[in-house]
Each structure stands twice: as C-alpha cells, then as structure tokens.
Amino acid sequence: MSVPGPPRLVVALDFPAAAPAEALAAQLDPRLCRLKVGKELFTRAGPQLVERLHARGFEVFLDLKYHDIPNTVAGACRAAADLGVWMVNVHALGGRRMLEAAAEAVAAAEGRTLITAVTVLTSHDAATLEEIGLAGPPREAVLRLAGLAQASGLDGVVCSPEEAAAIGERFGAGLLRVTPGVRPAGAALGDQQRIATPAAAVAAGCDHLVVGRPITAAEDPAAAAAAIAAEIAAAG
C-alpha cells in the first residue's frame, strides 16, 4: 500500500531503548509514515539511532521541545538540522528571541529541516494552565503562541486537534499544524486530554498527525499504521 504524496502520519517511537524502536521501525513502511523520536529514546540512543532510521528510508521528527536561552536553543537546532532530521521543535513559551534564534539557525543549515513550536501540551487542560499562571481556556493560549511562532519565522506549530481549525482560520494554511493526541475511535486516551480521530483531525486542518500507542502497542503495528494512513488519505 502507498499513499498519495508525502506521508502525513508520524509514528511516535515512545520506547525506552533503541532495540524495540528499531524492531517496530522494521515493521513499518516509510512510504506510509514518518517517525518521531522523543526525549527518552534520544537520550538513551543518541544521533546514531536517527542515522539508522534514515538508513531505513524514514524521515524523522526530532521531538525534543527545546526551551532555553536563545543561543543554547539555536545551537541545538543547528545540530538537529545538521543531523538531517525532517522536523525539530521548540517550546513557544521560550519567547520571541528564542524562537527567532532557532528559526535562523535552522535556515542557515544545509538541507531543509522544518521547525515547529509547541503551543500548549495536549496533556494540559484549563486547570493545569491556571496552575502555571496561564489563565483562560487552552484555546486562547494556543492562538497567542501560534501567532508568536508565525511572527518569529517558524514553519508551524504543534497543537491539539481541538485548536487546529482555529489556527488555520486565523493564520492561514501556510502555518503547518502538527497534531499529537490522535486516536482511532475506541482507543484508550492514555495521558492525552484533547484528542481526535484521524478523520476528525484532518477535517480540522491538521497537516501531520502523530500517533503512538494505537500503532506501537498494536498486535499488528504494520496493519494498524496502514489503516490509519488509509483513514487520513480518505479524509483528505
């Protein structure tokens, strides 16, 4: 099976070590999906794992959510771009100077790594935001941070399916929307609060859909990934 155009499905390799991550990758088709490497796996397995995933034909989203002083984040983003990853991300809460430094660092590197900003984590709800000093509904914070990311020269934002449509309406299709919290109908919620099915996420305007446990914990990960990729393609 193949899908038209570049794959929009991103499979989250949320594993504690390289061996199970690579075993899962061996069952997947790079024509159907990209792969996401997060903090735990990257800390344990390092850039060498990313290089091995590249050798299998996969494009990699390096999901490390950098948030530090501008110079430090710029250096980290430059290193990610030099590694050849498809996408890297930062926290929009790092502020304009940090976001601009990150965007400039990626733009100056060889190749074309996309850079996106995390707005509000999908594990956060209004009560959680209030605890950290961000009063109001998550949607308001997401839109404010998405605008900051766009003004700072980033390619897109990481947002929940709930806010994707509002971001598109306000900022246009040119700002990519990368969406975790995607679950097929009937799947367990896990630690996500603001979720949607793949078809609903596409209908909301999401460009890239990140799916983890519904694929990685499936009895047949290849079949699960193919089914979700087909649902995404059918939805638009």
From Swiss-Prot:
| Annotated coiled-coil segments of the chain | none
> In terms of domain of life, where is this protein from?
Bacteria
Supply the gene name. pyrF
Disulfide-bonded cysteines: none
Q: Which UniProt keywords apply?
A: Decarboxylase, Lyase, Pyrimidine biosynthesis
Q: How does it assemble?
A: Homodimer.
Q: In which pathway does it act?
A: Pyrimidine metabolism; UMP biosynthesis via de novo pathway; UMP from orotate: step 2/2
| Protein name per its UniProtKB record | Orotidine 5'-phosphate decarboxylase
Which processes are annotated in GO (biological process)?
'de novo' pyrimidine nucleobase biosynthetic process; 'de novo' UMP biosynthetic process
InterPro entries in alphabetical order: Aldolase_TIM, OMPdecase, OMPdecase_AS, OMPdecase_bac, OMPdeCOase_dom, RibuloseP-bd_barrel
Query: What one GO molecular function would you report for this record?
Result: orotidine-5'-phosphate decarboxylase activity
Q: Where is the active site?
A: 65 (proton donor)
Supply the EC number(s): 4.1.1.23
Q: State the Pfam families in the record.
A: OMPdecase
| Annotated GO CC locations | cytosol
What EC class is this? lyase
Family statement:
Belongs to the OMP decarboxylase family. Type 1 subfamily.
Which parts of the sequence bind substrate? 14, 36, 63-72, 122, 183, 192, 212-213
